[in-house]
């Protein structure tokens, strides 16, 4: 995983599905960004099985080092927004704060999905607050493929 938010979301989804990753010998490790993947893998004991989850624009870094890479398009937030649907996401987020951002000239006329994506990413506090809420609201049958596959394959 690139960051702590990926870990939080994956652990939450696994827990909701009744999985105990620790007892299964699975550890979700945020590496502090895609640039660290080569160094991270080099520091592992030989034979350690590693799966990667990353954003689309950084997949090439993971694929240089790992065979088992799962790519979020364009990123984790995008996967969650699409899986939940715009209306459900709007039920979860602070509509007043989101509406304020929508009034910015750069946001006018942009698709709602892209506005939500931008709004979630524009504040680390907001990002870390809402990603777990979005994952909690997600129907387990609708887990986005990269998240499902990194946990269940």
Language-model-detected regions and their locations in the chain:
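Acidic, divalent-metal-binding catalytic cores of TOPRIM
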Residues: 1-153
